[in-house]
Amino acid sequence: MIRVLLVDDRADFRRAFARLLERQPDLEVVAAAGSLAEGRTQLSGVDVALIDRGLPDGDGLELIGELRAVNPGARVLVMSSTAEMRHPTEAVEAGAEGVIDKLDDSERVFAAIRGTGA
């Protein structure tokens, strides 16, 4: 079972995406947060963190280093809109395993989560 932390500021997206993830037999959403502050309280006990870049209280990339300090084995996928996908190197340089497009096909997102090696 891959334990997932979902950090996105849009509550409707978080709920819908969490439901999609929970339908997968090997994925479990163990925490969801809408801001950096909330995300910081949920960093332990996750295998993969899906982190949005544009959070109301800062850049989601800030959580990557904090996650690594608390949970060194966790993997990170940064979620981004299509426009932000033009510069994925920032996320990878910050320590993410990759970047996924929020609007991408759900099967591709599931494959990316599974492909992190978590």
Predicted regions located by residue number:
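Conserved acidic segment of CheY-like receiver
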Residues: 1-12, 17-21, 49
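Acidic, metal-coordinating helix/loop segments flanking the phosphotransfer/catalytic sites
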Residues: 32-48
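Acidic catalytic/metal-coordinating carboxylates
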Residues: 35, 59-62
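C-terminal output helix
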Residues: 86, 104-117
